[in-house]
Amino acid sequence: MSSSRPASSSSSRNRQSSQARVLAQTTLDAELNAEYEESGDSFDYSKLVEAQRDGPPVQQGRSEKVIAYLQHIQKGKLIQTFGCLLALDEKSFNVIAFSENAPEMLTTVSHAVPSVDDPPRLGIGTNVRSLFSDQGATALHKALGFADVSLLNPILVQCKTSGKPFYAIVHRATGCLVVDFEPVKPTEFPATAAGALQSYKLAAKAISKIQSLPGGSMEMLCNTVVKEVFDLTGYDRVMAYKFHEDDHGEVFSEITKPGLEPYLGLHYPATDIPQAARFLFMKNKVRMICDCRARSIKVIEAEALPFDISLCGSALRAPHSCHLQYMENMNSIASLVMAVVVNENEEDDEAESEQPAQQQKKKKLWGLLVCHHESPRYVPFPLRYACEFLAQVFAVHVNREFELEKQLREKNILKMQTMLSDMLFREASPLTIVSGNPNIMDLVKCDGAALLYGGKVWRLRNAPTESQIHDIAFWLSDVHRDSTGLSTDSLHDAG
């Protein structure tokens, strides 16, 4: 058996372990959410997290509670107040769902437009062309011909009745076209050029600054991007929030306005960013909450719809009530969050090479760029899109730092391997790799090591007991006899 097969098996076990951890975490997220819904104002998040951590392991499984929780998170029917929403049938361009504030925002007659004698009424079945000027209606209809409609965002439209301009932000959902409408403020310069180009121009200076950085320092990279986002958006606090292997989070870099309590270096439990929310960040990479105290707006759907309209891709989607309470408790009234999505590291290159080419670049959520503000704050779509560009460039450079770290690590390993090999050649006994300087612990990052040779055990630092090492050796020869080596995060999971 080739050496790649055991490595591939180890890689597969690691993936299975990761999937099991995510499932267990999702179950815990669901239990905490259920406790929040039931307890209301008496909900004590810290106490419950500690109880879960110190208590028995979470029972895994797709229970009804977990499924209901995921549906509740991903299929909410509320939006925020900074815009309105329409869902359109792609064939007829008729409205099949609308937010309760849409009629007022899109059809209110303005005295500045006196020629409107019979203003359109907005409801289920209304043809969206009747709501906007010919140019805007044509631009919206043009989106139907694009496989990726987001490439056109934002589309500038004008209401027939009021003449007011709106950014139309379009995406496809199951069975329909969902359009977010955000008013263009009088102080804004409307995005008349291609949306992506306009947004890139806004982020160009920050992107140039990041691209000019020398490699080799993740801290410098994070500090730079945090400073650029702070200058670009004007929020009170900006953080680079990094996820660790066990899914807990750390504030890795931070900049604040004067007088704010620093969060830098703080670690938060995995439940702080639920798995369902992480999934949504992989789908919709920029998330803005303008005012956590504002009342959410209901979305009304046609009664005869054969499918459920998902708002997962909507920029207007209202946050979960638990998160709103969490924000208010932190005195963070508004937030803007960008997902940092990087290539998933495969620990074994040979195992990776056995996979089809299209599967080699799996993605994962490295962390988040998080902006907090102590008062309501709205960031227009072109600037949000610029922040998304910036986060993408940042992610590319995070990947580069991973590669540099990997190359340096491999270089040091080869150097140490050569030194230890020379020591073994010079000495008649392998004891030199545990008794000498350097020793085997300098080759592999670890808390302890052990050598079993001639029936005797030599232990270094935080290693298992002698009897446990004998048990592990017997297990390896029995279960993994054909393996040239074994690497695992859990001996239990490895069999």
UniProtKB/Swiss-Prot annotation:
Tree of life domain: Eukaryota
Post-translational modification: Contains one covalently linked phytochromobilin chromophore.
Gene3D superfamilies cross-referenced by the UniProt entry: 3.30.450.270, 3.30.450.40, PAS domain
Annotated residues for binding of phytochromobilin: C322
Keyword match Transcription: yes
Gene Ontology molecular functions: photoreceptor activity
InterPro entries reported for this sequence: GAF, GAF-like_dom_sf, PAS-like_dom_sf, PAS_2, Phyto_chromo_attachment, Phyto_chromo_BS, Phytochrome, Phytochrome_cen-reg
GO biological process entries: detection of visible light; regulation of DNA-templated transcription
UniProt KW keywords: Chromophore, Photoreceptor protein, Receptor, Sensory transduction, Transcription, Transcription regulation
Region (Disordered): 1-24
All copies of domain GAF, residue ranges: 217-402
Coiled coil: none
Compositionally biased spans, kind Low complexity: 1-21
Pfam families: GAF, PAS_2, PHY
Family: Belongs to the phytochrome family.
Function: Regulatory photoreceptor which exists in two forms that are reversibly interconvertible by light: the Pr form that absorbs maximally in the red region of the spectrum and the Pfr form that absorbs maximally in the far-red region. Photoconversion of Pr to Pfr induces an array of morphogenic responses, whereas reconversion of Pfr to Pr cancels the induction of those responses. Pfr controls the expression of a number of nuclear genes including those encoding the small subunit of ribulose-bisphosphate carboxylase, chlorophyll A/B binding protein, protochlorophyllide reductase, rRNA, etc.
Subunit (UniProt): Homodimer.
UniProt protein name: Phytochrome A type 5
Top-level taxonomy: Eukaryota, Viridiplantae, Streptophyta, Embryophyta, Tracheophyta
